[in-house]
């Protein structure tokens, strides 16, 4: 079979690019032909593409950008031969990167996928200025989905806000076989959309005979490591605020490294535009010495206590770091996610468990009305072996929890990390996900209707869909499909 993973371009891909990479490899290893395609607001040329690839290959691109640049950390996906990074996603040639405002854009797309069996969609146009070209209405983007029924189209859902941010997917239900949800929160929120859905957890490629790379706790020289995109939900500032308490009063400071980039990182480190929320204050930190109240940034104080910033690392370098790391930290929390789950296991934590690092996560209980009033059963939370820190922990409580974690016995560390590796092998396996997608696509609508849950478009979904499709793009609903 021929499988294409496609999207309408966005910024800030984050861990989704690793999802794509490992699914491509899984399909390829199962004997299928794979490719990547993207619809973009702007076109490119073969000359520009070749020049940039030459810079990637020679290392010139990495040498000429800033240490923390979002354009850093590019590496080559050997499965498809394209370069990618964790911020901008895949860098594609003109054959696979279609400028939607080109006169023949839809025809080029349909020619590219004419022999495809399955298309996995990551993103579609929502209410964004990126698709608002002056003088040109983008009221035809639905035509990229207007393909023959023999081509099975599946939408990949990565977001627990999907029923609000991308609810206009409901306008495409006649063309989508099902939605594949990458985590429990995404699956639960899609109950508000009238398209069948499956829970296929955020996958990683794992060889069938793979074993966890054993490296004893005492031989791992990196104490704590966190690599994330700096955005509001990640709450990297809370980890950074905890570092002075982690290293205060200890005989030998713990080694703490963080990596990643994003607009919030710029606000944390700017000498003149540091956001107030990224300053040390007694309001944030009741244990802060009064003389520091409003006088120093969280970032600068953490650096004084030993934090090291690694810039924008490639996926391979992150994995290498995790193999030498004792504790991998995800400081993120979200009141919206708390309606559906107790914690969120993202791609970084999955990578950590594959490399034998011990995860540190947040407990979402109490963040939302639903998490207080309802007993939310989260099977992943119940089964993962992790250090759990409450979402509302003070910087001192956070830091002392990390201190305590570091006293874990090597025996418990090994036992728990082996357990987590097997959990990933069983539940986050890209080959299993690929096989399930193929099985459902081969069975078609009859199998999907029989086996998968299907939600109902909520009033809110219908309202948002109408606003995006009709008011913003000028697309009359329901869509009259031509194919």
Give the ranges of each region predicted by the language model:
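Conserved catalytic-core segment of nucleotide-activated headgroup transferases in glycan assembly
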Residues: 206-209, 216-315
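Nucleotide-sugar-dependent
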Residues: 316, 330-350, 360-371, 379-380
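A short, glycine/small-residue-rich beta-strand->loop->alpha-helix junction that serves as a flexible
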Residues: 7-21, 44, 127, 232-234, ...
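Short beta-strand->alpha-helix junction loop in the catalytic core
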Residues: 159-161, 184-186, 195-212, 229-231, ...
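Nucleotide-activated donor-dependent transferases that construct or modify glycoconjugates
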Residues: 1-13, 38-40, 123-125, 223-226, ...
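A short, active-site helix/loop in glycosyltransferases that binds the activated sugar's phosphate group
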Residues: 160-198, 235
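A charged, aromatic-enriched C-terminal amphipathic alpha-helix characteristic of glycosyltransferases
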Residues: 15, 393, 407-470, 474
């Amino acid at each position: 079979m021929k499988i294409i993973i496609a999207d309408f371009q966005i910024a800030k891909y984050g861990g989704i690019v690793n999802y794509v990479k490992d699914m491509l490899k899984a399909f390829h290893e199962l004997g299928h032909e794979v490719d990547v395609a993207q619809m973009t607001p702007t076109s490119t040329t073969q000359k520009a593409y070749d020049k940039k690839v030459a810079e990637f290959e020679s290392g010139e691109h990495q040498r000429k950008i800033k240490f923390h640049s979002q354009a850093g950390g590019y590496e080559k996906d050997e499965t498809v031969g394209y370069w990618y990074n964790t911020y901008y996603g895949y860098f594609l040639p003109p054959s696979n990167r279609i400028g939607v405002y080109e006169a023949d854009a839809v025809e080029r797309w349909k020619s590219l996928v004419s022999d495809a069996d399955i298309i996995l969609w990551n993103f579609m146009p929502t209410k964004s200025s990126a698709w608002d070209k002056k003088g040109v209405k983008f009221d035809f983007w639905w035509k990229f989905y207007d393909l023959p029924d023999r081509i099975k189209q599946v939408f990949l859902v990565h977001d627990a806000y999907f029923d609000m941010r991308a609810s206009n997917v409901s306008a495409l239900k006649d063309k989508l076989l099902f939605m594949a949800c990458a985590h429990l929160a995404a699956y639960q929120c899609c109950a508000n959309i009238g398209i069948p859905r499956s829970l296929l957890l955020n996958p990683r490629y794992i060889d069938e005979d793979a074993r966890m790379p054993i490296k004893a706790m005492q031989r791992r020289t990196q104490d704590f490591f966190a690599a994330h995109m700096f955005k509001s939900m990640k709450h990297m500032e809370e980890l950074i605020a905890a570092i002075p308490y982690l290293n205060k009063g200890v005989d030998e400071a713990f080694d703490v490294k963080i990596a990643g980039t994003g607009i919030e990182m710029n606000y944390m480190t700017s000498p003149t535009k540091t956001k107030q929320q990224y300053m040390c204050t007694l309001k944030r930190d009741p244990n802060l010495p009064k003389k520091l109240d409003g006088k120093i940034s969280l970032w600068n104080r953490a650096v004084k206590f030993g934090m090291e910033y690694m810039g924008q690392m490639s996926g391979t370098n992150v994995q290498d770091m995790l193999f030498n790391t004792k504790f991998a930290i995800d400081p993120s929390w979200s009141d919206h996610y708390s309606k559906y789950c107790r914690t969120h296991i993202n791609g970084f934590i999955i990578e950590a468990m594959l490399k034998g690092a011990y995860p540190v996560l947040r407990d979402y209980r109490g963040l939302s009305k639903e998490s207080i009033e309802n007993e939310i059963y989260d099977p992943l939370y119940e089964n993962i072996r992790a250090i759990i820190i409450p979402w509302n922990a003070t910087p001192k409580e956070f830091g002392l929890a990390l201190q305590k974690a570091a006293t874990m016995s090597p025996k418990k560390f090994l036992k728990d990390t082996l357990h987590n590796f097997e959990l990933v092998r069983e539940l986050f396996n890209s080959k299993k996900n690929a096989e399930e997608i193929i099985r459902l696509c081969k069975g078609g609508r009859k199998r999907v209707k029989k086996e998968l849950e299907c939600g109902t478009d909520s009033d809110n979904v219908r309202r948002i869909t109408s606003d995006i499709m009709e008011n913003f793009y000028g697309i009359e609903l329901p869509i009259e499909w031509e194919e």
